[in-house]
Structures are given as structure tokens and as C-alpha cells.
Amino acid sequence: MLLLARCLLLVLVSSLLVCSGLACGPGRGFGKRRHPKKLTPLAYKQFIPNVAEKTLGASGRYEGKISRNSERFKELTPNYNPDIIFKDEENTGADRLMTQRCKDKLNALAISVMNQWPGVKLRVTEGWDEDGHHSEESLHYEGRAVDITTSDRDRSKYGMLARLAVEAGFDWVYYESKAHIHCSVKAENSVAAKSGGCFPGSATVHLEQGGTKLVKDLSPGDRVLAADDQGRLLYSDFLTFLDRDDGAKKVFYVIETREPRERLLLTAAHLLFVAPHNDSATGEPEASSGSGPPSGGALGPRALFASRVRPGQRVYVVAERDGDRRLLPAAVHSVTLSEEAAGAYAPLTAQGTILINRVLASCYAVIEEHSWAHRAFAPFRLAHALLAALAPARTDRGGDSGGGDRGGGGGRVALTAPGAADAPGAGATAGIHWYSQLLYQIGTWLLDSEALHPLGMAVKSS
């Protein structure tokens, strides 16, 4: 039965993508034929991203020098790619040693160089440094940085070489010298800690039958507080976890508001709804205008990556007003980072939205288009409903037919789908859901690289 369901889902996903490809979509890279990108060479002394190398937005902090006798030496792997020339002036093979992430990016760059300039190869002049020839806390000491040129040493090519390094996925690229380009990557554990789109296990949701529940304890049949596309509160079925890692230690963005005082933790690539500038700070989102939080339209609230939310912007929180519960915009007071070891969980509801710690968030991550992500999961929701209909004897544990709409604010209650526990992926299996992995893979084929958050999904190095 599950195999059949997966086959049906694949067919539906393909149909959905074909249809969307014929349309002119609202997002970057959507609904249009991808043309070869025009690459612009970096200028001398330019670096991308435009932040310091050892900051969160680039390659991250220095984690300590690696020597041949240290425990961390096993983190380094030799690169024997025949398409790369290693200078290795020390004759120790040190320049070939690097982290797996650095190796993957370097190998990708080698292919780009050969495609850009036939007959020319990538040349590495400096890799891992064990002799202390670089500045203090240089990432060369960790095997996370390389200095590169082209094999013909044609300096007129170096600006474009730097651009190719950016496109290959290096986390920081610097046209450092007229003689070479400097590239570096994040630490392996740093990438894993910051990747994905999740909430910590300590986050809470509101249940239809009253009370709250830790997000890590959600199970099929639970109905949790969410919002529709007009910003009205309702209860929606919890379907599955798109990602679940009980033992994860993650870096979360901490979004805090003061009036009312709320605190939400979520990973960098997760989507959070932000109110437009003309949305009254004291009023409810107007249903008549279609400007409710989940719409993501140009004039209404939009969903942003958590890493892009800034103090002064306004998010939607649940507040009591005139004895009624409703969504109100609240100004973000601070955005900080916190490392938590409470696990990481990405719940999916039928509505595609969820109230976490009384703050409205999307169920989706990786791509900054909530509406498109929700459409992409339509086949999954359909399969879930079909399988539920095939097992009418089973009922949801979270259902309470007499509960009505306890969310207030004129909200609507979604119908409970019996047999939800039998839906594909409804169990609490650890790891990333197979459907999410499928969509991510398709997205990497169809979308521009800028459309996907760089920390959207932790991908194992090959």
C-alpha cells in the first residue's frame, strides 16, 4: 500500500511541476526557462559574501589548529584529483589535505575551470598548513582554506576564477592577491548544526482539545493551532515531521518580541511570516483584502528566512483582545543566536502553517516562497487524504468533535481526516522525510542556486 502511495505521489509531483513550469510564477527561478547565467568576475580585493571570513555569514569561526598528531587530523582527507595541480612546495603532500567539504567544492571548481578554459586546469598553491606560515587563526591550519590560480598562471583569468569559486559553493571567496584567489569553507560540524529548517524540541504548540504540547511529542491525529490564508486562526491536522533529529545540537535564531513578549527559536532556513509596513500594529490582518499572513503576496505579509528577519520588522503572534484570540503583528525586539541540544523538529500541518510558542510560522523551509512550497506538498496531502479514506475505521486521537473553534478570532476548524496514522510518512521516523528529499533534489535541478537557502538541508559529503 505504501509503495503504491509513493508511486502515485511521484506521478502527482511530476504533473504539478510540469504545470508550474508552463506558468509564469512569482518567485525567483520559477515558471521560466533557465538561461545560462552571465558570470561577472570579482574585482581585485573583493570578497563574497561581503562579510568577514570568520563570521557566521561566511566560513564561521576558527576552531583550532590541526597538527599531524592531533585527534582532529582524521578530519582531513587527501585530494588526488588528476584535474587539479597541487604545488606542494614542501614535498609533504600537505597541500592535498583538506576537509571533505573543502574537497567537494574544490573538485566542483576544477570541472568549472576546464569548462571555462579548455586545456587549463585548477592549480592549488596552498592548502592545509602545518608550518605556521599564515596569520594567526588562519583557516589554512584547519584544512578549510585553499589559495588557487589557473595552471597557466594567467592573472587576467583570476577575477573570473574567483567568480567560479563562488558558483562552486565555497563559503567565502577573496580576490586577495594579484597572485592568487583565497577560498574557504565552513567547518563540517558547523554546517550540520546550522542546516535544515526546524524548531527545537522544547517548542510548544496549542492543541484543539486545550492545553499545549511539546513539538517533539506530536503524533498523527493531533490537531494544532494554525492560520488560514486570510490570517484567521483554526486548528489543522498534524501530518508528519519533514525532519526529525532527537539528538541534534543545532544553532537557532532567537526571535523575540516585547509587546506581547514572545520568544521563538528556529533554524536559519525556516520561513517566518513578516507583516508589511502598512499593517497596523494594533489591528488584525484584514481578511477582506486577502493580506493574511500566509499569502506571501507582494503587497501583503511575506515569508522570510529566519536568517533575514531583523529587529523592527513585525511578526504575527496570538494575543487576547476583547475576550477573543487573534493574530496581531508584534515588533521584533531582538534577533540573536543560540545553540540548543534539545533536538530539531519540522512539523507539517495540512494548512502549511503552525503557531509555535504563540508565533505564526510556516511549515516550510529552504525556499523563500511559502505558497509554492505549499503547492509542492499538495500531492502529499492528497495521498494522505486518500489513504485516510481507505481506512475509515481509524480515527484521530486528537479529535474532539464537540470542541468547536477554541482558537477564537472568527477562526475555522478543519475537518479531521480519519486514518491519518496510515498516511505515508506519518510516523515519527528520524531523519529527513523522503518527500522533502525528493522535492529538494528536484529543486536543485530546476531552480537557480540563489533560490535555495545555502543552509536549507544538510547534505552528506561524498
From Swiss-Prot:
Effect of W117R: In HPE3; the same mutation in the mouse sequence causes a failure of Shh processing leading to retention of the immature glycosylated protein within the endoplasmic reticulum of transfected cells; causes a temperature-dependent conformational change that allows Shh to bind Ptch1 at 4 or 32 degrees Celsius but not at 37 degrees Celsius; drastically reduces signaling potency in chicken embryo neural plate explant assays
The UniProt record lists the keyword 4Fe-4S: no
Site residues, Essential for auto-cleavage: H270
Outcome when changing E188Q: In HPE3; familial
Protein's name according to its UniProt entry: Sonic hedgehog protein
Record's compositionally biased regions (Gly residues): 400-412
Family: Belongs to the hedgehog family.
Origin species: Homo sapiens
Site residues, Involved in cholesterol transfer: D243
